[in-house]
């Protein structure tokens, strides 16, 4: 198991380009199941979760080729299996995204429940309830979701709670349903719009993605296309915060600022000097003092839960007290205990973190607990005095492409070491 060794105290400077968005790429890979023709996906990030999704499709009989342009040519026609086995699903909850496409295209699917997933408390039930409303029959048996359908039929569906993957799953399934499907109480994340754009490029008829209602007019089949994955807004936000906590000056290229409007707003409140084009965001904290900012996470277009941990670090070294309220996920403060080992002064009260700024953080041996928590520990190591070791970094490799290489390019000093 590898770890990262970080020597703190280096200001980050320079320009960096975002990788393709993991949260856009995963449903797009699943969407290739809907087509009888090849789909070419460009700008896919090189991440463990992408590899896992390819392994999942490959286990069903899909053919995936890296072509001469370094794009992935995917053929999911005539799959010989429609089962997503636990060995793969347990490592990535997004595996559930193949459920809707498999039932819509092949009339059947057997998907292992994601590891540690309690149906009552996680939004997987939103997927299942909505798929049943489209006409599927679903049985939960021996840790698997077994779904069948002779035909899916469009209907009006209101999700019981906002769910990104649930919205994506049903949006994909409805593309091959008979008639029109109306989805309300839907997620509005940019990645929903990205998926709709891909589906429409495959000759689907999806309208209203990113608004309060998504309308899908079913078609008989979808075609092949070539599509480029947009930049990862969470990766962009993470590097902007890295610049802020190291008192640096970094330009993130290839990202639409509108996708990070709330993050940018909070960075400006913190004292950062921000400049933007329609395709880049630059942040300078060289001549500013960090100010604490209060944050409440919520579904898009509000402040993203995936940036909460990074802002915890920024607030931890700001002068004053701040509050972070996590309203999207339970147990999203697991990084706080590790940050406190580095000198942070953070107290957790339920879904609230009260952060009292300190003068300095100090290097320590810390352990990542999840993807965004691992990012926060790396940021803390960058601005800490001395040396920090972050273990269990397989979490970071699930969502950040070559993070230590990119940060080193900006002036950090990070080594990847075997345990």
Model-predicted regions and their roles:
Residues 1-419:
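Short, structured segments at the rim of ligand-binding sites
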């Amino acid at each position: 198991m590898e770890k990262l060794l970080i020597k703190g105290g280096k200001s980050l400077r320079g320009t960096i380009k975002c990788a393709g968005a993991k949260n856009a790429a995963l449903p797009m890979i699943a969407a290739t199941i809907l087509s009888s023709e090849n789909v070419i996906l460009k700008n896919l990030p090189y991440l463990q979760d992408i590899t896992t999704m390819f392994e999942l499709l490959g286990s069903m009989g899909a053919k995936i080729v890296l072509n001469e342009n370094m794009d992935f040519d995917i053929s999911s026609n005539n799959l010989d299996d429609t089962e997503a086995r636990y060995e793969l699903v347990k490592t990535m909850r997004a595996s559930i995204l193949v459920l809707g496409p498999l039932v819509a295209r092949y009339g059947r699917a057997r998907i292992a429940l994601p590891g540690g997933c309690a149906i009552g408390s996680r939004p997987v039930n939103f997927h299942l309830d909505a798929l049943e409303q489209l006409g599927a029959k679903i049985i939960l048996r021996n840790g698997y979701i077994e779904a069948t359908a002779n035909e899916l039929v469009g209907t009006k569906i209101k999700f019981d709670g906002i769910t990104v993957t649930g919205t994506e799953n049903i949006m994909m399934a409805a593309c091959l349903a008979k008639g029109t499907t109306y989805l309300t109480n839907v997620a509005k994340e940019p990645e929903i719009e990205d998926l709709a754009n891909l589906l429409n490029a495959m000759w689907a008829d999806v309208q209203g993605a990113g608004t309060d209602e998504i309308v899908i007019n079913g078609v008989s089949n979808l075609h092949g296309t070539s599509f480029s994955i947009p930049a990862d807004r969470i990766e962009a936000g993470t590097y902007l915060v890295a610049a802020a906590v190291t008192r640096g000056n970094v330009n993130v290229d290839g990202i639409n600022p509108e996708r990070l409007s709330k993050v940018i707003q909070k960075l400006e409140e913190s004292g950062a000097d921000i400049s933007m084009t329609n395709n880049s965001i630059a942040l300078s904290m060289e001549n500013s003092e960090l100010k604490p900012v209060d944050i409440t996470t919520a579904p898009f277009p509000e402040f993203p839960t995936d940036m909460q941990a990074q802002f915890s670090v920024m607030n931890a070294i700001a002068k004053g007290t701040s509050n972070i309220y996590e309203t999207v996920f339970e147990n999203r403060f697991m990084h706080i205990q590790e940050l406190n080992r580095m000198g942070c002064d953070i107290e957790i009260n339920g879904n609230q973190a009260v952060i009292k700024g300190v003068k300095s953080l100090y290097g320590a041996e810390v352990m990542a607990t999840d993807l965004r928590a691992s990012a926060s520990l790396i940021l803390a190591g960058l601005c800490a005095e001395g040396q920090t070791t972050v273990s269990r970094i397989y979490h970071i490799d699930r969502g950040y492409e070559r993070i230590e290489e990119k940060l080193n390019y900006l002036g950090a000093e990070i080594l990847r070491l075997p345990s």
